[in-house]
């Protein structure tokens, strides 16, 4: 089945893919393309509407991103968000100027008129502003449909041409009813229906895998996390014993993780192959302190290990990975100019010397969609609800060089923190929780003795997709329990701190 999409043009906002996720959450399929996508390629997708994303630049900048203006002649409904609004205003003859008061943060949206894009939402709702330029005069044919304290044109529309524009970001978590606004655009302005769901996605992926693989075999990288487990299950559904699932113990796993992974797959009747490559990984990481180099080394070593394992089996032509949409957007601008944050170990394709063709069935879906897909495939909720764990493992939760003593220290602290969260019911209330070994020592007193030991940081965040996150407001008594237990039970740690940074500006992981 071909899904008729809403096409999102990416002008460089780190929030672009959240727009797509919010639409899919409403059952509306969406695709993201670069801002300069050829008009013919856009038309070939037969979209029901177009959204122009936000972006980091000014429309008047020398290197400003501009789309093919033919999009405005297609007769399709269009929604511009922030930078997208300024592009629309500029194109149709309005004026855009630097704002006298930059508007960053929450604002109250006041409706000026009734409009279907506001259907079932509250006047006075809180929205998220993040802009330096603003529309001074709106183009002919447009009317203001909402304002805020610092934005006389917080939302505008040309009703006759079905062109809408928001100065705020409806897609981000802080916009109270932003999801409804996007849903209203898709359903009431574009006429989309709710046909996108993980049941149909699973069927489509199974057929695509079968068509692509034929009678060949697929080597599947398994970590035991949600993503790789869903990939392995999807492959097993599609091609049965043609999938060869391989779990690599890289020495960077959490406490008891190898045993848990092996038990889980055995209970599902999957013949999991375990490769102990911990010494290989740790030897290659010796002396390396740069986080980007650590990620690259781990990614390259994974590929080498899989290549060795593949040679033990005949007929393998494919390698499967659990790459997600968020991995892609944070690694490389494959769909637009969004700025690179960090590389991911499973993104960027395979080296030229490797003979495998890559299969990434989750590459275009988000974490919440992966969990829904896992439940659709019959995986247990206990596994589906596990917190995300990065491919590079504990290597990027140790600041500086990675070695066995520090890994053991971090594992012990992590076990205690997770135990407290599970026992208090906060594990399932948060998106991700972990500890970071800072490799910063400080003076302390234990008993009558002076100590000079390590500092551990506790990082707990709330999120829905990992693209944005806020630090979790854990009760102080629970944080106190975590701190007291770690300091009392783990030799070598005398200080525990709590990370209260949100994303952005910080990333969730420290490296």
Swiss-Prot record:
Pathway: Purine metabolism; GMP biosynthesis; GMP from XMP (L-Gln route): step 1/1
Active site: 82 (nucleophile), 169, 171
Enzyme nomenclature, EC number: 6.3.5.2
Entry-linked InterPro entries: Class_I_gatase-like (IPR029062), GATASE (IPR017926), GMP_synth_C (IPR001674), GMP_synth_GATase (IPR004739), GMP_synthase (IPR022955), GMPS_ATP_PPase_dom (IPR025777), NAD/GMP_synthase (IPR022310), Rossmann-like_a/b/a_fold (IPR014729)
Catalytic reactions of this protein: XMP + L-glutamine + ATP + H2O = GMP + L-glutamate + AMP + diphosphate + 2 H(+)
Gene Ontology terms, MF aspect: ATP binding; GMP synthase activity
Keywords noted in UniProt: ATP-binding, Glutamine amidotransferase, GMP biosynthesis, Ligase, Nucleotide-binding, Purine biosynthesis
GO cellular component, one term: cytosol
Cited function: Catalyzes the synthesis of GMP from XMP.
PANTHER family membership: GMP SYNTHASE [GLUTAMINE-HYDROLYZING], GMP SYNTHASE-RELATED
Protein name in UniProt: GMP synthase [glutamine-hydrolyzing]
Species the sequence originates in: Aliarcobacter butzleri (strain RM4018) (Arcobacter butzleri)
Gene field: guaA
């Amino acid at each position: 089945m071909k899904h008729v999409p809403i096409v999102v043009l990416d002008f460089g906002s780190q929030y672009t893919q959240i727009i797509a996720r919010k639409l899919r959450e409403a059952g509306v399929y969406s695709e993201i393309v670069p801002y300069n996508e050829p008009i013919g390629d856009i038309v070939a997708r037969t979209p029901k509407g177009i959204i122009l994303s936000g972006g980091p630049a000014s429309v008047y900048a020398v290197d400003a991103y501009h789309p093919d203006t033919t999009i405005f002649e297609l007769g399709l409904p269009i929604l511009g968000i922030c930078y997208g609004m300024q592009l629309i205003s500029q194109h149709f003859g309005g004026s855009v100027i630097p704002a006298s008061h930059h508007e960053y943060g929450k604002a109250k949206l006041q409706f000026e008129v009734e409009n279907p894009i506001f259907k079932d939402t509250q006047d006075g709702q809180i929205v998220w502003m993040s802009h330096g330029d603003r529309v001074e005069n709106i183009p002919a044919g447009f009317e203001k449909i909402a304002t805020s304290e610092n934005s006389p044109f917080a939302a505008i529309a040309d009703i006759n041409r079905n062109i809408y524009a928001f100065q705020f970001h409806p897609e981000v978590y802080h916009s109270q009813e932003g999801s409804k606004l996007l849903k209203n655009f898709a359903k009431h302005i574009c006429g989309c229906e709710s046909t996108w769901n993980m049941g149909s996605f699973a069927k489509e992926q199974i057929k695509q895998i079968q068509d692509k693989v034929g009678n060949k075999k697929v080597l599947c990288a398994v970590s035991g996390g949600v993503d790789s487990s869903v990939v392995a299950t999807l492959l097993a559904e599609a091609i049965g014993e043609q999938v060869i699932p391989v779990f690599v113990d890289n020495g960077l796993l959490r406490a008891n993780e190898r045993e848990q992974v092996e038990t889980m797959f055995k209970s599902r009747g999957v013949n999991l192959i375990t490769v102990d490559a911990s010494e290989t990984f740790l030897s290659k990481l010796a002396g390396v302190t740069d986080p980007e180099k650590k990620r690259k080394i781990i990614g390259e070593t994974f590929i080498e290990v899989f290549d060795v394992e593949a040679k033990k089996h005949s007929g393998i032509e494919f390698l499967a990975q659990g790459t997600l949409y968020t991995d892609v957007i944070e690694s490389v601008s494959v769909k637009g100019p969004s700025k690179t944050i960090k590389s991911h170990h499973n993104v960027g394709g395979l080296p030229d010397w490797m003979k495998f063709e890559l299969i990434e069935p989750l590459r275009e879906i988000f974490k919440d969609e992966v969990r829904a897909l896992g439940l659709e495939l019959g995986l247990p909720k206990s596994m589906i609800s596990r917190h995300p764990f990065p491919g590079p493992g504990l290597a990027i939760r140790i600041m500086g060089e990675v070695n066995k003593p520090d890994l053991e220290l971090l594992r012990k602290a992590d076990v205690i923190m997770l135990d407290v969260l599970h026992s208090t019911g906060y594990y399932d209330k948060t998106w991700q929780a972990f500890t970071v070994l800072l490799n910063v020592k400080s003076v302390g007193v234990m008993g009558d003795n002076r100590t000079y030991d390590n500092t551990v940081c506790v990082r707990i965040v709330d999120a829905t997709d990992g693209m944005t996150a806020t630090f979790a407001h854990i009760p102080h008594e629970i944080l106190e329990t975590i701190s007291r237990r770690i300091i009392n039970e783990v030799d070598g740690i005398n200080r525990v701190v709590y990370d209260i940074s949100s994303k952005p500006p910080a990333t969730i992981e420290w490296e």
